[in-house]
Structures are given as C-alpha cells and as structure tokens.
C-alpha cells in the first residue's frame, strides 16, 4: 500500500511578519525549525520511513524536508527539488503585509485574491525588487507574473503525474515538503475536492498530512498525524 506524506514548511520569516511570500525566498524562523523537527520526530516515532522525497526550490521547504528526514535519521534519502512545487505566485502582493493590503484595497478584495479559486492577484510590476527573472534557479522557466490557485494546480499536477505518481505506483514511500497552495493542489486532486472545498482546506505549518493510498493511488485514508 503506497504511503504519501505531505508537509507544509515550518513557520517562515514572512509568515511571522504576515506578508505575502509566494516565490520569494525567505528562511524558516526558529519556531519553523522546531515545527519541522517536531513533525519529523513524530513521523519517526510512528514508524514512518521514506524512500524518496520531493520539494520546491525555496529554502523554507527544502529545509523543512531536510529537517523531517534528519529527525528520522534518513537525511540520505534521495530528494528532488523542482520549481513546480513552489508556492503560488502572489504577483504584485509579494512582500506586502496582509493587514496593510486589506486597509489599502479593502478586506473583501484581499479575501477574493487569497481565497478564490480562479482570481489571481494583480501582476507584479516591471522592475519590482521581487522580480526573479535574474535568478538562475529559474533558467529556462517562464516565471508567472501572478497566479490563482487554479494556475498553481495547473503546474503542480503535470509534475505529480510525471515524477511523483510513478514512484508511488512502484511502491515507494514518498515525502513531499512544500507549500500551502502547492499542497492544496495535490489534496484537491487526490481527495477530489471541489473548487469551493479546496480554498477552505487549511494546512498548518509543519504538521504532516498522511495519505494511505490504494495501488491505483485513490485514497484509502487521509489524516493529519496529530489526529492519530
């Protein structure tokens, strides 16, 4: 029976500052390190082991994945990094404080940008200090100007089908350390959630979500580790 564990990264510096982060690369806070380590220890104590791990190309997710593996004394497990597991791109909201943004644009508009399925935030302005066009980790990648959750799903699922699903079908035990919205894309796909259901689905930082899957990768069970 294939096992899949999804873990959102631990608290980041911009989670703490209540800023829209998206593709911008920020580090974990001390609390974030503790969350990731605690999640890894809880997985190890409950007998979870992994054969392969997948993560994004952003520091907060990479470190979380490594801390989970290290807690289980399996830092040697092969880990693949790919930009398609990055967080949703928040476009022109990147770097802005969420409360300040609500004061400027209105809480209702910000709620639509954050929690609608198919409405993206305004695009990032040309010349923004958060422009990533010169970042070599994205060589050959068409960096989005902004993304809705629907757009995020559209880039995550091909990677799932191409790289992750085959490992699970081969019986591998898989860990994915990523972000709230890229993981929502996978939960929507696996659990067949509607557009309305997935925007309400919350993934706490550093809390592993376990899928026990049938051989055809339909879910047999899904639960947060702290629920069992």
UniProtKB/Swiss-Prot annotation:
**Alphabetical list of Pfam families matching this protein:** His_Phos_1 (PF00300)
One annotated GO molecular function: phosphoglycerate mutase activity
* UniProt pathway annotation: Carbohydrate degradation; glycolysis; pyruvate from D-glyceraldehyde 3-phosphate: step 3/5
Enumerate the residues marked as the site Transition state stabilizer: 179
Intrachain disulfide bonds: none
Reaction(s) catalysed by this chain, per the record, are:
(2R)-2-phosphoglycerate = (2R)-3-phosphoglycerate
Keyword Ribosomal protein part of the UniProt annotation: no
Question: What's the protein here called?
Answer: 2,3-bisphosphoglycerate-dependent phosphoglycerate mutase
């Amino acid at each position: 029976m294939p096992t899949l564990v999804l873990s959102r990264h631990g608290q980041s510096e911009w989670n703490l500052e209540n800023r829209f982060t998206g593709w911008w690369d920020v580090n974990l806070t001390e609390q974030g390190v503790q969350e990731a380590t605690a999640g890894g220890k809880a997985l190890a104590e409950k007998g979870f082991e992994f054969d392969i791990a997948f993560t994004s190309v952003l520091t907060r997710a990479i470190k979380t994945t490594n801390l989970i593996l290290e807690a289980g004394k399996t830092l040697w497990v092969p880990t693949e990094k790919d930009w398609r597991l990055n967080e949703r791109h928040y476009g022109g909201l990147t770097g802005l404080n969420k409360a300040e943004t609500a004061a400027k644009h209105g809480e209702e508009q910000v709620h639509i940008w954050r929690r609608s399925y198919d409405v993206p935030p305004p695009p990032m302005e040309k010349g923004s200090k958060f422009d990533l066009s010169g970042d070599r980790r994205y060589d050959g990648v068409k960096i989005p100007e902004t993304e809705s959750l629907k757009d995020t799903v559209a880039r995550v699922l091909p990677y799932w089908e191409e790289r992750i699903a085959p490992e699970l079908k081969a019986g591998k035990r898989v860990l994915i350390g990523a972000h709230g919205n890229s993981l929502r894309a996978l939960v929507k796909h696996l659990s067949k959630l509607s557009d309305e259901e997935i925007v309400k689905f919350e993934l706490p930082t550093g809390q592993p979500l376990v899928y026990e899957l049938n051989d055809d990768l339909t879910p047999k069970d899904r639960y947060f580790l702290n629920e069992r």
